[in-house]
Amino acid sequence: MDCLTLKKSNCKNCYKCIRHCPVKSIRFSGNQAYIIGNECILCGQCFVVCPQDAKQIVDETEKVKVLLQSSDPVIVSLAPSFIANYEGVGINAMREALKKLGFFDAEETAVGATIVKTEYEHMVDSDTRDIIISSCCHSINLLIQKYFPAELPFLANVLSPMQAHCKDIKRRYPNAKTVFIGPCVAKKDEAQYYEGIVDAVLTFDELTSWFKSAGIKLDRETDSDEHSRARFFPTTGGILKTMAQDNPKYTYMAIDGVENCMAALKDIENGKIHNCFIEMSACSGSCIGGPVMEKFHRAPVKDYMAVAQFAGNKDFEVDQPDSYELQKNFTVIERRLQPPSEAEITEILHRMGKTKPSDELNCGSCGYNTCREKAIAIYHGKAEISMCLPYLKDKAESFSDNIVRNTPNGLILLNEKLEVQQINKAALKIMNLRSPSDILGDGVVRVLDPKDFLNVLQTGRNMHDKRMYLAEYDKYVEETIIYDKEYRLLICIMRDVTQEETVREQKENISRQTVEIADKVVDKQMRIVQEIASLLGETAAETKIALSKLKESISNE
């Protein structure tokens, strides 16, 4: 089971998770980020920095509730950083609240820390290793197992405080189930990988949600115990603070933050560090800076003070197991990634638009530190070419510039002060301007009537295909004005329709002349018809008179 999951619909392509992932164990495909399980060290930085909360820690609350339904006692191992997360709430108040949820008991993981630090002291006194690296932090263990396998011999083969404590609980309560509660994502993986010691892991956030749903309020009750020095464990240098540090052979040092730890491991790899006991913590500030703490409760100074005030001056009184009972074996975790050849990297860089060294900006906007690192990620299928912001910007600008340059329509871009910000060649031609410098930065009133622009700006209603005559340029244009509210810009598109208008006028003239000729022909024909009718009328009258006279003459005879 993966400890970190993803809300697919929430990813917004900001690449922040890649940028903050120290080992770049995130694959990006189809506008979606995916965590690569066999490369991830579970530091939780992607969970912390994701602005969309697209990364989720797998919630084991239901699993714990199932454990509570059994007849076996379920005992909590509570990480010592709880005092920083739950301000003013001591172990007794936490124990009472946890019992209300159904737990049999709750103990401090610091008990296990005392066991572990004592074993470290034995190692320092009896071990022949040049360097000893603490193995309390599971993320650091994974970092060494996956990325620095040559340094595995230096990793202390000792159980973590969580494991040592839960193992001690099961020694005292053979039928017990153990649940660790802390600020860490990696502990969920550690519990799963090393089966039979820790039965479930909850984060402080999961516990807080459970308290709220159950209606349990924590009593602000602090307590103190002189025998509780191991409560310092969740702070940077906390392990060393509990150790004797009396072996002159070793230099004792504490390193926190994955980047710093990686730098130290590289120095060890290169033979630059010797005779050291190194406390390593993946989180800045150690466990009080864990992902759940950093995400929801980031107050490093205040948290350290809370831990320091809660910790005692002496060790917990515990039964120290034999060393063999505390042994933990670490093996190399293979990642199986073959590096690309130089030719393959160059070919990918060319596809990214990086044809020469000066093109490699190494801006980091894609999440990778260098363009070459990004090219290698593309080769391994972890990244896409489209993730390069300068590449996309250049591509978009080239595309838009080609459109602006080559469109036959005039384009003018104005700000809200009606000042010309951009103008293309077609618009220059319409307005008889020689170059953009003749008008850029000046008011549009110099070349066009601003009335339509003001109307669009004031009403917010765009104007489309308004035909007008520009008398000063003796040209007809169809003008469209669009107001971009987001960028506060006015976009004017002018189509020169002078030729169309000339053709239209010519056609109108021809039509008018044709109508006039037709009217003249009709008039002439009507006159001819009228003349013919008049002549026919006179002839008919004369004929009638003649016939009448002929009729009368015949009748008289």
Question: Which positions does each model-derived feature cover?
Answer:
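Sensory coupling linkers of modular signal transduction proteins
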Residues: 483-528
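PAS-family sensory/regulatory modules and their coupling/dimerization elements
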Residues: 449-499
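Sensory modules in modular signal-transduction proteins
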Residues: 395-429
